[in-house]
Every structure is written in structure tokens, then in C-alpha cells.
Amino acid sequence: MNSIVYTTKTQHAVMGLRASLALLFVCGVVYTGTVTQLGGALFPAQAKGSVIHRDNVAMGSEFIAQPFVNPAYFYSRPSAVDYDPMATGGSNLAPSNPALRERVMATSQEIQARESVQAADIPVDLLATSGAGLDPHISPAAAKLQVARVAQARQLAEPQVLTLVAQFIEPPQWGIFGQARVNVLKLNLALDQIAKHAQ
């Protein structure tokens, strides 16, 4: 009797192991491989991370923010993860948290000094991190706030830089989701193209 029970348990264990291995193969190999191949065939740029290249050099992904510290470039919004794509996330600090207030105040003072503006003129997206910490966009207002600095650093006329900003304003997704926005990397690369053609 005991041997029959033992045999039945062993059979069930073997069946469970076979089912697990089959599902692992189907979900981990067949499904993943199929989706990867389809993605590469139908959406080759997106499947490879939407990386923007200039002169065969990868400049970054259009969907991942990166820090810009040169005054000749538009700056991205703050990142709670120091722009690390492997550690996406917000700061999780509550609005009542003193650490959040201190960080926002420090960022505000830095922007006021850098852009020669008042605190009330600073758009909120230049003070607040995004949910993922890697939002590659800023608002049109945040871009326009930086125009004077960028124009001066590049020795360009402000109207020329404003026109460039206007060209890179993206509408809300499908016209209804989100707000108008400017991709910082694309805008900065366009600035570099202007400088390249001016030489």
C-alpha cells in the first residue's frame, strides 16, 4: 500500500516537473523569442531602445533622460535616481517631508541663479522629479525659461533659439493624453546641428 502511495506521489511530482519545464520553455523561450523577433521586424528602432545616433555614435535614448550640465544645453528635469536607467523610480517623499521641501528649495535657488529668474517664474517640472525619475521631456515653459542662457552660451539670437524650441514642441499623446512637451535630447542635438552648420 505504501509503495502505491509513494509511486503516485512520484508520478505527480514528475508530471508537475514536466509541466513546469514545458511552461518555462513556452513562456521563456518560444514566447520571448517570438515577441523579440516580431518587435525587431515591425519596430526595429523601438526594439533596440529608441537610441538616437549622430555620425554612428549613440547619443542616448529618446525615452530616457540624461543630465546636461553645460550651459549651452537645455537642462532636463531633476531625477530622483540620478538619471540611472537601472534604478528607475521616484523619491517617494511625501509632500509633508522636510527632505522634499529642502531639495525643492535648493533646486529653486540653483535655477534662480542660473537662469536669472524669480522663484515664481520656475515651472514645476524643473523642480519636481517624475514618477520614473527618467522623464526625457520638459514643458514648453521650462524650455522657454532656459532660452536666454542657451542663446548667450552659444552666441545665438534668442528668437532663433525660441523658434527651435517651438519646432520641438510635441502635442499631447494622441491629442488627449498628457500635455505638450519638449524632448530635451532631441532639442539639444538640434542645437548642435546649428553649431555644426555655422562652422
UniProtKB/Swiss-Prot annotation:
Membrane topology: Single-pass membrane protein
Coiled coil: none
Molecular function as annotated in GO: ATP binding; P-type potassium transmembrane transporter activity
Location in the cell: Cell inner membrane
Pfam families documented for this protein: KdpC
Presence of keyword Membrane: yes
GO annotation, cellular component aspect: plasma membrane
Membrane-spanning parts: 21-43
Superkingdom of origin organism: Bacteria
UniProt KW keywords: ATP-binding, Cell inner membrane, Cell membrane, Ion transport, Membrane, Nucleotide-binding, Potassium, Potassium transport, Transmembrane, Transmembrane helix, Transport
InterPro entries in the cross-refs: KdpC
Quaternary data: The system is composed of three essential subunits: KdpA, KdpB and KdpC.
NCBIfam families in alphabetical order: kdpC, PRK00315.1
Record's function text: Part of the high-affinity ATP-driven potassium transport (or Kdp) system, which catalyzes the hydrolysis of ATP coupled with the electrogenic transport of potassium into the cytoplasm. This subunit acts as a catalytic chaperone that increases the ATP-binding affinity of the ATP-hydrolyzing subunit KdpB by the formation of a transient KdpB/KdpC/ATP ternary complex.
Family membership noted in the UniProt record: Belongs to the KdpC family.
PANTHER family in the cross-refs: POTASSIUM-TRANSPORTING ATPASE C CHAIN (PTHR30042), POTASSIUM-TRANSPORTING ATPASE KDPC SUBUNIT (PTHR30042:SF2)
The name this protein goes by in its record: Potassium-transporting ATPase KdpC subunit
Organism: Shewanella putrefaciens (strain CN-32 / ATCC BAA-453)
